[in-house]
Amino acid sequence: MKQSSPEPLRPRRTGGRGGARRAAALVTIPLLPMTLLGASPALADASGARLTELREDIDAILEDPALEGAVSGVVVVDTATGEELYSRDGGEQLLPASNMKLFTAAAALEVLGADHSFGTEVAAESAPGRRGEVQDLYLVGRGDPTLSAEDLDAMAAEVAASGVRTVRGDLYADDTWFDSERLVDDWWPEDEPYAYSAQISALTVAHGERFDTGVTEVSVTPAAEGEPADVDLGAAEGYAELDNRAVTGAAGSANTLVIDRPVGTNTIAVTGSLPADAAPVTALRTVDEPAALAGHLFEEALESNGVTVKGDVGLGGVPADWQDAEVLADHTSAELSEILVPFMKFSNNGHAEMLVKSIGQETAGAGTWDAGLVGVEEALSGLGVDTAGLVLNDGSGLSRGNLVTADTVVDLLGQAGSAPWAQTWSASLPVAGESDPFVGGTLANRMRGTAAEGVVEAKTGTMSGVSALSGYVPGPEGELAFSIVNNGHSGPAPLAVQDAIAVRLAEYAGHQAPEGARMMRGPVQGSGELECSWVQAC
């Protein structure tokens, strides 16, 4: 059957490496090494006064009170020569938070390839009979992290166009491409309601243009004072249960609304009070068994396209004895090169874990975390990364069982910079201060008005007590790779400390700050305990 052509995830915005704009979705372009700039004397002269001043400045920044009691691994390298320009605790094993996604993305490009795409099929045992009937129907997922409700509707239309009018038996959601382990063993149970801790499945429906997997958008609207608030479960309407105890408070009263999914349930619980004059409140919340939600949505799509399902909707794999199953519809995702943009720009945990399990399928025929993480480490070793200081427990960095060193992160950055997929890798990284979220990502609101704006390309990482920023500073005087990994701070994440270092590196690489925006000496303030994209703050 002819496969549908994938649509670009976003229009492309052009710009060279280190320019003011970064591609949001890729087209065919020449792949250029990231180390084309030779080392200028200003960068290469390790005995120069400029380098001494740089080291002193970074030392001063790291004295900030925000880092009291913390351990910080900081390494800066000239990518052209491999020369280490700065190092503090570079060999210390630390939690990486979402900097783990750098390793996952590199392994996915190495194992799957930048042109890899993910398929979803609709299968029956045979073609429809004269009455347009088939017995059972299977919606088969193979790890597409961007499958949307619109894609399901398009496949339902294909099923109808194939002549199917009635499914006499059941509709099954087949997610057996991956195993049935939904969550990493040490992820915190209290995180389960939130989009950054969604269940992982080979068949999941992505929400919105950022492709959040395994979630639904819950909307709460005030009614008349004293009346229950109105709750819309979005895509999960009719699939998840609703426990609505939220009330409408007086105009101007406090908003105490809480939207939860209690652990082990498929119930959205809404409590608290929403003022009568408040705007509607929306929040992404996870669902139990994302594949079952996909099946529910596909049944609705079939009904909308004139196909009736007589039986139930459930989970199940295509029978092994269906040697010549009839594929009635299919969908092919965009290529990995494009999928990496929402994955890395918005630090999407669901994408990371689906990629790990896809790597496991590719390397070992097993869509499991165990197989996938072995595949990730082997790919990194094959790339030339020294993995001795690396401990992998998931692909996203949400696990507190992961360990990296700043040395290893910078090693990865250097090896990735000379890989055939270097341009694809670069295009996926957030760019400092760029207001377009598909360019700036989690750095969209950071380092604006500084020498780093539109220049620094780096992956963020933040969760309680852990924060990191690692990436590149290209410039007219050469290119730097850097990693900053902070662990053990007791207050908010020291984002401004990281930003001050990145700005100083941009200045060192030859960029000029706008008038009045030079780096300020002395204390800087941090903020946030989670990635800004996880809480819809960027």
Curated annotation (Swiss-Prot):
Removes C-terminal D-alanyl residues from sugar-peptide cell wall precursors. It catalyses: Preferential cleavage: (Ac)2-L-Lys-D-Ala-|-D-Ala. Also transpeptidation of peptidyl-alanyl moieties that are N-acyl substituents of D-alanine. It comes from the Bacteria. The active site is at residues 98, 101, 347. Inhibited by benzylpenicillin, cephaloridine, ampicillin and cetiofur. The gene is dac. One of its GO terms (cellular component) is extracellular region. Keywords: Antibiotic resistance, Carboxypeptidase, Cell shape, Cell wall biogenesis/degradation, Hydrolase, Peptidoglycan synthesis, Protease, Secreted, Signal. Residues 516-538 form a propeptide. This is D-alanyl-D-alanine carboxypeptidase. It comes from Actinomadura sp. (strain R39). NCBIfam families: PBP4. Substrate binds at residue 459. Pathway: Cell wall biogenesis; peptidoglycan biosynthesis. Its EC number is 3.4.16.4. Residues 146-319 are annotated as: Absent in class-A beta-lactamases. Residues 1-49 form the signal peptide. Belongs to the peptidase S13 family. GO terms for molecular function: serine-type D-Ala-D-Ala carboxypeptidase activity. Residues 1-21 are annotated as: Disordered. SUPFAM superfamilies: beta-lactamase/transpeptidase-like.
